[in-house]
Amino acid sequence: MAGSPRVYNSQHCGFSVAVMRFLLLLLTAVLISLAWLSPDHSYPWLTFASEMLSFAAFLSLLALFLNRPLELPRVQLLALPVVFIPMIQWGFGLVVDFSSALLSSAYLLGFWLTMLLGYNLSRSSADRERMFTLSSYLLFAVALLTSLIACIQWLNLESHVPGVMNLYSHRPYANFAQPNNMSTFLILGLLGCLYLAEKQKLKQYYIWPVAALIVFAITLSQSRTAWVFGLFFIIYWTYKSWRYPTHLKRYAVLLWAIGFFAVGLLFPRFTRLIQKLKEGNVVQTSSVVERASAGHERLGIWQQMLDAIHQKPWTGYGWNQTSIAELSSMSSNTIHVWFTSAHNVVLDLLVWNGWLLGGLITICILIWICWLNVHAKTTESIIACLMVSAVWIHTLLEYPLQYAYFLLPVGFLMGLIQAQTPDQTARSVPVSVIRSIWVIGIMLLALIWRDYNLYKVNSLRILKNQPANIEIWGSSKILVLTEFDQRLYWLKLSPVAPLTSTELDQIEKMVQNKATPYNLQKYAQLLLANHQFEKAQQQIAYLNRLHKKDYTLQDLQQANASAVESSK
């Protein structure tokens, strides 16, 4: 009898741990779901709400290890130095802004840590199946909601449904505000359906109608990235299902893939039919041929970025500073568009870091992905590889990994795949380190929320010619997001203010990194007011070419005269 209290306490403790684990996993699922479904896309940080929710989900998942150590595979240590590259570049003056470098390093660290979390939560085959099943259920549910939202937009009914974004183009995008991002996410949901069907976790009559709706919503997006992945899927699944037999018949799965292409070809006719039956307007869509023959701007972007790399082959232009590379290589610009990404992750890495470092990072990523794929032999790891491939294929054409709601889940999935690779030596990360990271993460997230909202309030006051003196938490000073602090100064600055050459050079770096029409025009006005006519003419040329404007030096002189008059 003397041992009974200890047995009871042990059982009670185990029950409490299980409940806490369940609650944290549930909270993580809710937060990342809200990140995917958030309709809040407001200027200047369009995905601010989704990014905050994604990192909150990450911290919720990290809380599972506040009382137990994380196992760190030694191979993972090779990737850790990459986390600090943006901050090192800022220290040497290559990255213009501190907060840009800090956030870049924070995103890289988040990606690295979610890989560790995926690895540690999937060490055994039972844990791996459990985690991937939960992930597939989550993707299944959110993809269903996203598909319904896309259909609502396609039918022009979004104004009648709360929580749904208004559609401003002919390609539905649900609440992602970007059709290709929606398409890639729906592919993840479709692969979740495949896993649930393969492992018989749900009845077929639940899965296939939802899968059909998801395929239809992907077609609505008219994403060419989805077509590329469809071809990749056919090849990959044919090979893997031949090597490792599956429950589902190979021909049945491949018929679904072929059906996706058939729906795309027939979709314009289907749209016209629905329009007749509905006796109203539905969103007009392009045909497959029209979509395939459009959007060749990427070729011009890639060519210009190669020229930019040749200009700075060793150091690059700094992490997340593709815009500076574009303005530095305007002599080879063939497209009239301002871009902040090379629309290809390999080119972005080379632009940011130069041939040597960027090439080394690219080669390591390629080797790592191939290594994971070679060891993908179970249903969980094979379908996880397909999910990761969907996002990585997207990165070759756009920039999905700049969004935390893709970056962090991809890290988690890659950690899950890595957990089933054999003979990995690992060391333990002390609990104290995990707790420190968690506390710093909470504090950083809170400060970012504060700084961003402080900027939004005070920037509106500046535009209304009111003093920017609103305080949050007892201060009106921006602490972490220094880029927004510079923007407040920039908004307050008169376009005819007398400045030194050093001050103008500092502003030039900021403008090159954010070459919006407002920034280019105002900087040109400043140069003109400070008698730097050639540079002013150059900024006008950038403005006209990148944003399809038609300004002249005389227009700026008139604008400056008006600014002088209004300041009297």
From Swiss-Prot:
Transmembrane segments: 17-37, 46-66, 78-98, 101-121, 132-152, 176-196, 214-234, 251-271, 349-369, 376-396, 397-417, 429-449
Gene Ontology biological process terms, A to Z: protein glycosylation
Record localization: Cell membrane
Disruption phenotype: Cells lacking this gene lose the ability to glycosylate substrate proteins and their glycoproteome is highly affected.
Keywords for the protein's UniProt record, in alphabetical order: Cell membrane, Glycosyltransferase, Membrane, Transferase, Transmembrane, Transmembrane helix
Mode of membrane association: Multi-pass membrane protein
InterPro entries recorded: O-antigen_ligase-rel_domated, PglL_A, WaaL-like, Wzy_C_2
Residue pairs linked by disulfide bridges in the UniProt entry: none
GO molecular function: glycosyltransferase activity
GO cellular component, one term: plasma membrane
Entry's EC annotation: 2.4.-.-
Pfam families: PglL_A, Wzy_C, Wzy_C_2
Function: Catalyzes the O-glycosylation of multiple protein targets. Is responsible for general protein glycosylation within A.baylyi ADP1. Does not act as an O-antigen ligase.
Family: Belongs to the PglL O-oligosaccharyltransferase family.
Protein name listed in UniProt: General O-oligosaccharyltransferase
Organism, scientific name: Acinetobacter baylyi (strain ATCC 33305 / BD413 / ADP1)
